[in-house]
Amino acid sequence: MTAWQKIQKIAPAAIGACLFVLSIGAINSELHHYGWQNVLASFQGIVKTRLAGAFALMLINYIILTGYDTLAMFYLGQSLPLTKTSFVGFVSYAISNSVGLALLSGSAIRYRLYQSWQVSAPIIAQAIAFCNLSFWVGLLTVGGITFVVDPLQLPAFLHLPFLSVHPIGFTFLAIIGIYLLITGNLIKPFKIGQWQTPKIPFAVSLAQIGLTAVDWILASGILYVLLPGHHHLSFPGFFGIYLLAQVAGIISNVPGGLGVFETVVLFLLTPKYSSVQVLGALLAYRVIYYWIPLGSASLSLGAFELLQHRRERRQKSGSESE
C-alpha cells in the first residue's frame, strides 16, 4: 500500500474525529457559559404536549423509514412479507442512525436479517445499494429544492466563494435531473470507472424521492416542535438549517452526527433563540429521535437472535433424533 493510499484510507476517519473534537469543544464552551443546570431546566421546561407531538412524529417517521426496504424488495421482485421488510428497515435505521458509519452498520444488519430468511447474497447486495441510493436521491432532491427556494445565508467568516446555499441547491438539483433523465430513459446510462448508473424505473425513482421527502420533513419536524415559540422562525426557514446540519453530520461520519449536528444548529438558531433553549431542545431531540429507537431496535435484534438460536437448536436436535 502506497503512502497516498494510506492517507486516503485514514483521511475520512481523521477528518471525522477532528470535526467531532471541535464540535464537542464548541458545545462544551456553550455549556460552560450557560451551565448544565440551565440547559436541563430548559429541557424539563419543554411543554408536555410538545414532547408528545415530537414522540408521535418519531413513531410516524420510523414507520416511513421501513418503506425503504419494502420499496427495495418490490423493485427487486422479492415477495418477503411486509412484517419482515419493516423489521429490517426499523432495526437497521434505528441502530445505524446512532452508531455511525451507516453504510457499514446498516448493511451488516440487513445482510444478517435477510440471510436468515434465505434471501440470496446478490439480492441482499442490491437491496443495500438501493436503500443507500434512495437516501441520497431524496436528500439531494429535498435539499436542492429547499436551498434554491429559501436559500440559507452562510456566515462570512467561513470565507466561501458563495454567500448562500443557492449554488449548492442548484448543484443538487442538477444531479437529480440527470438521475431522472436516466431512469426516464431520456438519456443512456453511463459508467464512471467501475460504477454504472442503475437501471431503475421512473415510477420507482419518484417513489424514492417522495419517501425520502416525507422522511426528512418528519425528522426535522421533531426538533421544530421542541423549540419554543415558532413565531421566531417558520418551518421552511428551519428546514434549510436542519438539512444543512444533517449534511454536515453525515459528512463527518461521527455516530449520529453527535456534536457536529448540534454545533451547526446551535450556531444558526441562536440569532432566533437563546443557546439554552436550543441546547434543551437538542437534548430532547436526541433522546426521542436517536436513543429511544436505538434501545427498542437493540432489544428487538437481541430477541430475534435469541429466537433464531432456539430455532436452530430445535432443528439440530430434531435432525439428530432422526
UniProtKB/Swiss-Prot annotation:
Keyword vocabulary terms for this entry: Cell membrane, Membrane, Transmembrane, Transmembrane helix
Protein location: Cell membrane
Family: To E.coli YbhN.
The name this protein goes by in its record: Uncharacterized protein slr0712
Transmembrane stretches, start-end: 7-27, 54-74, 87-107, 128-148, 162-182, 209-229, 249-269, 287-307
GO cellular component, one term: plasma membrane
Topology in membrane: Multi-pass membrane protein
